[in-house]
A protein has these predicted regions:
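A loop-to-helix transmembrane entry motif
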Residues: 113-130
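Membrane-helix interfacial "entry" motifs
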Residues: 37-40, 44, 116, 120, ...
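Short helix-capping/hinge motifs at transmembrane helix termini and TM-loop junctions
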Residues: 31, 107, 170-173
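Membrane-anchoring/interfacial helices and their immediately flanking loops
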Residues: 93-107
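Short hydrophobic membrane-inserting alpha-helices and related fusion/pore-forming segments
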Residues: 120, 124, 164-178
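Membrane-interface interhelical connector segments
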Residues: 104-116
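Membrane-interface extramembranous regions at the lipid-water interface
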Residues: 1-35, 39-97, 126-164, 180-203
Length: 203
């Protein structure tokens, strides 16, 4: 019998994957000194809305993935790590949102640069923390005997590579793009969860 939770979670993961490239592009535009203050604020607000929507959809899908592992396969090995990622990403989105809007309101100049730097440091630290935990999650998932129709391992690999990109900081945009593939694989796992029965060898 089809579980609507997994179907909804799949579409949320797809939504997050679709919004992520647009958010990345708008974030670059918002960081560029183009146009007047109102234009900068408009771009920043648009990036904020799309970025927040992508993050919310992605986090809900991640919560459902944890539920899928818990309920269908009795696996709880990444529960605490997923909780950490959810909390940290929520804080990161909030800090980035406040910083982006404040910088846009200030406009172009030394004050804007100083303000941006004040927000960049915590954002980088939070990104590194998320990257490290993503690597650990990926490694744990790679150790599972059951591959959930050959999708766990690709998801784990994307998690490790994207996490490494965030840890390296300079490759963070690449890591963000890899989240698109990660969410697509996650969506496929949700869709296929309704097509198969739990497998007892999942440990």
């Amino acid at each position: 019998m089809e579980d609507e939770r997994w179907t909804r979670a799949a579409w949320m993961a797809i939504g997050a994957a679709a919004l992520t490239p647009a958010n990345l592009l708008l974030s670059f535009l918002a960081d560029m000194p183009i146009g007047t203050a109102p234009v900068g604020v408009m771009i920043a607000v648009t990036a904020l809305i799309i970025g927040t929507a992508a993050a919310v959809l992605s986090l809900i899908a991640l919560c459902r993935f944890r539920e899928l592992l818990n309920e269908r396969y009795g696996y709880h090995g990444i529960d605490a790590l997923v909780t950490f990622v959810i909390v940290t990403i929520s804080v990161l989105v909030a800090v980035a949102a406040v910083g982006r809007v404040m910088v846009a309101l200030v406009g172009i100049g030394d004050q804007a640069v100083r303000l941006a730097l004040a927000f960049v440091v915590p954002i980088i630290l939070l990104g590194i923390a998320i990257g490290i935990v993503s690597i650990i999650v990926g490694i744990k998932l790679l150790s599972l005997e059951n591959d959930l129709q050959h999708l766990i391992r690709p998801y784990a690999v994307f998690s490790i590579i994207s996490g490494a990109c965030f840890v390296l900081v300079i490759l963070a945009p690449v890591g963000t793009l890899l989240l698109v593939a990660e969410n697509v694989v996650l969506a496929l796992m949700f869709f296929r969860a309704n097509e198969s029965d739990p497998m007892v060898e999942f440990v």
